[in-house]
C-alpha cells in the first residue's frame, strides 16, 4: 500500500520537477520515500517531522540508502502539532507540493491539548480539537489534528494522501464530519478520491483504513473505490497482514486514474450526490441495489405459490403441535414443598 499511495498521487504523464514532499508523521519514511521514487529522487526535496528520535535516525539512513542525501537537513525530530518546524522566513508555516501521511489514529495528547486550542497559526485546526475524555485518554483521535495540519500545510495547487480509520469517511457529526464537509463545500471541492483498503493492510494498525486523496487545485468529480475485499492474507513477523496482489494494485490504480465506474467496486458521484448522502465518502453507499426479475408463466407462478402455501401450512401445523406439547409438559409440573429443605437442614 506504500507504493500505491505514491502511484495514485503522481501521474506518470506529469512532468514533475523541483517539488517539495512532506510527511508530518514520517516514522522511518516509507511513504514519503515511495513518493520520492514515483516523482524521481532528484526532482524533489523531502521534508519530515516525527516525535520519535529513533524513527528520525532511521529516516536519515533511509534517505542515504535511497540516494536522497540532499534532504537530510530537513529530517526533524519533534512534536509536529505543538511545534511544527518547517517555516518560511516570516515565521509562517511552509506549504508543500505533495504531502503523504499515515498518522497515529489514537494517542493521549492531553498534556498539550491546551496548546493546540490556542494555536498561533490561525485557522490550522479549523474543524476543532478532540475533547479530553474523562476516561481512556489514550483513545483521543489525534489523527483528526494531523489531517487538519496536512490541509493547512498544502500549497494551493498541492496534492495529498492521508490514511484514516474507515469510520472517518461516514461519521455523521463531529470533527470528522466537518473536515469532510470542508473538502466538498470549501471555495473549491478538493476531494480527489477515497480508497477503502482491506483490513490489516498497514503494519501498525489492524483497524480498517481508507486513504483520502486531496487536490487543492480543485476537482470536478471524485472517485470512490471499495477495495476492502481485495488482497491475500500473509504472516509477517508472526502477525497476520493483508497484501495486495500486483494485478489488484494495477486494478485500483487504473480505476482511480481513469475514474472508471466498476460494479460493486467504484463510483464517481457528483459533489451534489455526496451532499445528499450526508457527505459520505464510502463507495458502498452509492452502489446500485440490484433486484433480479425472472420471467415465469402464470402456471409456473401458481405452482410455486401452491408449493409455498403447502410448506407454510405444514410449518404452522408443526408449530401448533409444539405449542400443545409444551403446554402439556407445563401441566405436569407441580409444586414440590420438599425442594430446598434438604439444603437448609444441612
Go through each PLM region and give its residues.
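Conserved S-adenosyl-L-methionine
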Residues: 1-101, 106-110, 115, 164-167, ...
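A conserved structural/catalytic subdomain of Rossmann-like adenosyl-cofactor enzymes
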Residues: 93-346
Amino acid at each position: 500500500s506504500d507504493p500505491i499511495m505514491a502511484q495514485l498521487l503522481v501521474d506518470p504523464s506529469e512532468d514533475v520537477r523541483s517539488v517539495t514532499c512532506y510527511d508530518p508523521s514520517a516514522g522511518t519514511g516509507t511513504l514519503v520515500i515511495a513518493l520520492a521514487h514515483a516523482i524521481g529522487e532528484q526532482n524533489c526535496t523531502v521534508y519530515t517531522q516525527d516525535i520519535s528520535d529513533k524513527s528520525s535516525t532511521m529516516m536519515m539512513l533511509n534517505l542515504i540508502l535511497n540516494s536522497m542525501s540532499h534532504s537530510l537537513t530537513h529530517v526533524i525530530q519533534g512534536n509536529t502539532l505543538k511545534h511544527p518546524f518547517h517555516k518560511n522566513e516570516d515565521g509562517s508555516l511552509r506549504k508543500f507540493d505533495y504531502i503523504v501521511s499515515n498518522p497515529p489514529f489514537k494517542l493521549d495528547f492531553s498534556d498539550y491539548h491546551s496548546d493546540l486550542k490556542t494555536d498561533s497559526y490561525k485557522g490550522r485546526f479549523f474543524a476543532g480539537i478532540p475533547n479530553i475524555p474523562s476516561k481512556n485518554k489514550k483513545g483521543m483521535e489525534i489523527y483528526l489534528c494531523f489531517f487538519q495540519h496536512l490541509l493547512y500545510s498544502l500549497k494551493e495547487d498541492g496534492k495529498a494522501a492521508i490514511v484514516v480509520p474507515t469510520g472517518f469517511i461516514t461519521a455523521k457529526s463531529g470533527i470528522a464530519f466537518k473536515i469532510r464537509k470542508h473538502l466538498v463545500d470549501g471555495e473549491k471541492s478538493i476531494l480527489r478520491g477515497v480508497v477503502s483498503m482491506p483490513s490489516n493492510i498497514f503494519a501498525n494498525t489492524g483497524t480498517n483504513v481508507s486513504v483520502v486523496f486531496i487536490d487543492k487545485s480543485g476537482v470536478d468529480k471524485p472517485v470512490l473505490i471499495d477495495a476492502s475485499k481485495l488482497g491475500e492474507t500473509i504472516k509477517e513477523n508472526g502477525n497476520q497482514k493483508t497484501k495486495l496482489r500486483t494485478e489488484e494494485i494495477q486494478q485500483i490504480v487504473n480505476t482511480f486514474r481513469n475514474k472508471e465506474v466498476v460494479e460493486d467496486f467504484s463510483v464517481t458521484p457528483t459533489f451534489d450526490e455526496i451532499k445528499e448522502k450526508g457527505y459520505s465518502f464510502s463507495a458502498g453507499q452509492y452502489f446500485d441495489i440490484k433486484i433480479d426479475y425472472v420471467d415465469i408463466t402464470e402456471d409456473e407462478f401458481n405452482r410455486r405459490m401452491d408449493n409455498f402455501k403447502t410448506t407454510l401450512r405444514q410449518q404452522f401445523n408443526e408449530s401448533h403441535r409444539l405449542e400443545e406439547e409444551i403446554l402439556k409438559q407445563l401441566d405436569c409440573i407441580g409444586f414440590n414443598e420438599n425442594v430446598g429443605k434438604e439444603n437448609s437442614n444441612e
